[in-house]
Amino acid sequence: QITYTKGIPRPVYSPIAAAQIPVVAGQVPLSYQPIAASRTVDPQYDPNPQYTFSYNVDDPETGDSKSQEETRNGDNVQGRYSVIESDGSRRVVEYSADAVSGFNAVVHREAGAAPPPPAVVRSAYQPVAYKSAPVAYSDVPAARYIQPVYNPVPLQYKSAPVAYSEVPAVRYKRPIAIPAGVRTSFTAPFGNYAY
C-alpha cells in the first residue's frame, strides 16, 4: 500500500496488506529426461548458393547507358557495374564481398566521348491559320423629338391643420403593502440562513 502525500510517495506497511500465499508441495521427479529436439531443415535452403547474372542497357534516345554483372559462390560475391555520366565519362565500379574482408569496392573513371545531344522532341501539332473578317462601322443618327413626350403638370402642396388637446391623466390609489409575518430559515451542515 502506498500513501500519496505532498512530495515523494513513501510506502506504508500494514499487516492487512501483506498477502499470505499458500505453497503447495508436489511430487518432484527423481530424474529428468531431456526432450529430444527435432531439427527440420527447409527443403529450399541452399547452404552453398550460387548464381550469375548480367544486364546491359544502351538507349540512344534517352542517353541511358549502363551495365552490370555479378557472380556468387557461397559467401563470396564478385561483380562490376558501369554507367555513363552526364559529362560523357564512364564510371566503372568493381566490387567483392566475403565473410573475411566484408564489402570492398574500387571505382575507376574513364574519359569518354562528349555527352550525346539531348533528344529533339517534335510536336505533331501545327498552329491553325485563321483570318478575321473586317468589321464594318456606320454612324447611326441620334433620334430627335419635335414635341415633348410628356406634359408636366404643376403640383400644389397644402398642409392639414394640426389640432392639440390634452387628455386627463388617470389616477388611482395604490394600497400600501404590508409585509407578511412569515419567516423562513434553512439549516445546512456549515451554517444557518434565515430569510
UniProtKB/Swiss-Prot annotation:
Entry keyword Iron:
no
Q: What InterPro entries does the annotation carry?
A: CHIT_BIND_RR_consensus, Insect_cuticle, Insect_Cuticle_Struc_Prot
Q: Report the domain of life of the source organism.
A: Eukaryota
**Alphabetically ordered keywords of this record:** Cuticle, Pyrrolidone carboxylic acid
Say which species the protein is native to.
Answer: Blaberus craniifer (Death's head cockroach)
Q: Give a GO molecular function annotation for the protein.
A: structural constituent of cuticle
Sorted alphabetically, which Pfam families does this protein's record hold?
Answer: Chitin_bind_4
Q: Which residues form the Chitin-binding type R&R domain?
A: 48-118
Q: Indicate where the modification Pyrrolidone carboxylic acid is found in the sequence.
A: Q1
A single GO cellular-component term from the record reads: extracellular space
Output compositional bias ranges, type Basic and acidic residues: 63-73
> Looking at the record, which segments are called Disordered?
38-78
Protein name (database record): Cuticle protein 8
